[in-house]
Amino acid sequence: MKFDESSLYNIKSDLDGIRCPLFDLAAWKNGLAFKKIDFSETGRPVIKIAELNNGISSNTSFTQGDYGEDVYIRRDDLLFSWSGNPQTSIDVFRYRLQDGWLNQHIFKVTANEEFVTKDFLYYVLKYLKPHFTQIAANKQTTGLGHVTIADLKRMSLVVPSKEVQEQIVLVLKAIDDKIEVNKNINDNLAA
């Protein structure tokens, strides 16, 4: 999907609501740049893009350090991987693994509930994935592309009332729940 410069950042909408920068809808906390010295055989996992895509594996690094609440991640936190190959690494996730520490190149996204619900923000970010992918591709150097805080501040969209947000979430969550059930059935059949 290709966007011109205007529609890439000024998200079109038929919804009634207030137009505001995407950045204002959440707190965006980048993970830490862990070093080999931080790693140990046990402890909490360091969550990189590979873990978001493939789960905890023998390649996952662990640490026994304590790095603060702002980079500690729990089940159902919203995460946005903003750096890497635009086609494979730029994405939005509901965190589903064990508690861990957030690595660099991933934002922990905490909804600003004054404007949006957490679930609505998740679906908005998923909807914007093609925009994020093109933004990252437009900046791609040596295989890596980025979506920066400046991009999040530049992007604007219409935010509907909380009632409309809840109606949208009801429809999309029902579909997501069905997909999850089918995925679990497929996983059990494959096992």
Predicted regions and their residues:
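Short, positively charged
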Residues: 117-151
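"Short basic amphipathic alpha-helical interaction patches in structured regions
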Residues: 62, 93-96, 123-124, 138, ...
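Short coil/turn segments at secondary-structure boundaries
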Residues: 35-42, 136-138
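A short beta-sheet element
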Residues: 48-49, 67-129
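Residues that recognize and position ribonucleotide moieties
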Residues: 15-18, 45, 99-100, 145
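A short glycine-rich beta-alpha junction/loop motif
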Residues: 100-107, 139-169
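Sequence-specific dsDNA recognition surfaces
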Residues: 18-36, 45-78
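Non-catalytic DNA-recognition/assembly elements of restriction-modification systems
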Residues: 1-32, 154-169, 173-191
